[in-house]
Structures are given as structure tokens and as C-alpha cells.
Amino acid sequence: MAGALRNAMVYLGLAEDDRYAEDTEPETTRPRVEAAREVRVESRHEARPEVRHEPRPEVSVERRPAPATTAQVTPIRKQVAHVVPQTSTTSSSPELHRITTIHPRTYNEAKTIGESFREGVPVIMNLTDMDDSDAKRLVDFSAGLVFGLHGAIERVTNKVFLLSPANVEVASQEEERPTERTFFNQS
């Protein structure tokens, strides 16, 4: 096993091959045990031609550093167009011309709700004709839609919701009666 490991190390270049180093030594300096071992191994070596490695002459390459030169640095400026803000002829909040009312029967009608709301049109969803599981899915979809487009969702009645875009403000009865909200708050 040690011989196989040694051969693997020699093959990978992790150790030197001692067989060739022994051949170059004078025979008088080797002990008799190694000579006896060579006699047994000699029959294996006779089939192979002997390879002698001659030392290579050392080649020295002289590298000289490049001569230092100084050069002018020219700054490069990128041409930027002059930007003039446009004045809008329309008002910043467009007038509300329509409200969409949708009575979905299946969850597949969520696309029409999303398209209308994305265009900035307030949507009233009447989910009374839907079963509870699909109605819940549609409310979850609408909540995500409202959150993504910075709008608001309000519950009008049981299973009826109002989706209002960010540019639409909804006035409710609570806002009209501020005294009733603060009447019980005596802190």
C-alpha cells in the first residue's frame, strides 16, 4: 500500500522519484540491502529504456522598467442638454367623469376590476352574487391592487367595496360630523 501511495505522489509531482536518483549514485556508497532490492527490481527496469535528465542551462531574462513619461491629462466633459420643465395646460387632478360598478360572478372577472382601477377610475365591487371563498380571493386581490397603486379600499356594506385611486378623495359621513367623533373622547 505504501508503494502505491508513493507512486501516486511521484505521479502527481508531490515527491521525487528515487529510482532514478539511485542509478546516478556510485555503487560503493549504496548499502547492500538496496543493491539486493535492485537485483529483484532490475528485471522490471530492463524492459523500459533508461531516461536520463540532463540539467537545463539557466536562462536569465532581464526586464527593464518602462521609462517614466509625463503626459497632459485632458478632462472630458459630457454634453448635457438643457432641460426645461413643461408647464401643463391641464390641472394636476383630472376631473372625475365616471365610476365603474362591477358585479363579478367568478374570480376570472378580477382582470376587469384591475384594468379599470389602473386607469384611475374608481370601482364599486358588489360581491353579493359570489360564494364566500371567491369573494375573499377577490377582496385580497383588490387589497393588493389598491396597495400597489397607492389607492384606498373602503367597505360600503356587506360584500360591497369601493376602490378609489390615489387621485380620488372620498367624503364620508364620519368626516362631515367631526363633533360626534370627539364628543366621547374626554381625555
UniProtKB/Swiss-Prot annotation:
<protein>
    <recommendedName>
        <fullName>Cell division protein SepF</fullName>
    </recommendedName>
</protein>
<keyword id="KW-0717">Septation</keyword>
<comment type="similarity">
    <text>Belongs to the SepF family.</text>
</comment>
<keyword id="KW-0963">Cytoplasm</keyword>
<comment type="function">
    <text>Cell division protein that is part of the divisome complex and is recruited early to the Z-ring. Probably stimulates Z-ring formation, perhaps through the cross-linking of FtsZ protofilaments. Its function overlaps with FtsA.</text>
</comment>
<dbReference type="InterPro" id="IPR038594">
    <property type="entry name" value="SepF-like_sf"/>
</dbReference>
<dbReference type="GO" id="GO:0043093">
    <property type="term" value="P:FtsZ-dependent cytokinesis"/>
</dbReference>
<dbReference type="GO" id="GO:0000917">
    <property type="term" value="P:division septum assembly"/>
</dbReference>
<dbReference type="InterPro" id="IPR007561">
    <property type="entry name" value="Cell_div_SepF/SepF-rel"/>
</dbReference>
<feature type="region of interest" description="Disordered">
    <location>
        <begin position="13"/>
        <end position="74"/>
    </location>
</feature>
<dbReference type="GO" id="GO:0005737">
    <property type="term" value="C:cytoplasm"/>
</dbReference>
<dbReference type="InterPro" id="IPR023052">
    <property type="entry name" value="Cell_div_SepF"/>
</dbReference>
<dbReference type="Pfam" id="PF04472">
    <property type="entry name" value="SepF"/>
</dbReference>
<keyword id="KW-0131">Cell cycle</keyword>
<keyword id="KW-0132">Cell division</keyword>
<comment type="subunit">
    <text>Homodimer. Interacts with FtsZ.</text>
</comment>
<feature type="compositionally biased region" description="Basic and acidic residues">
    <location>
        <begin position="16"/>
        <end position="65"/>
    </location>
</feature>
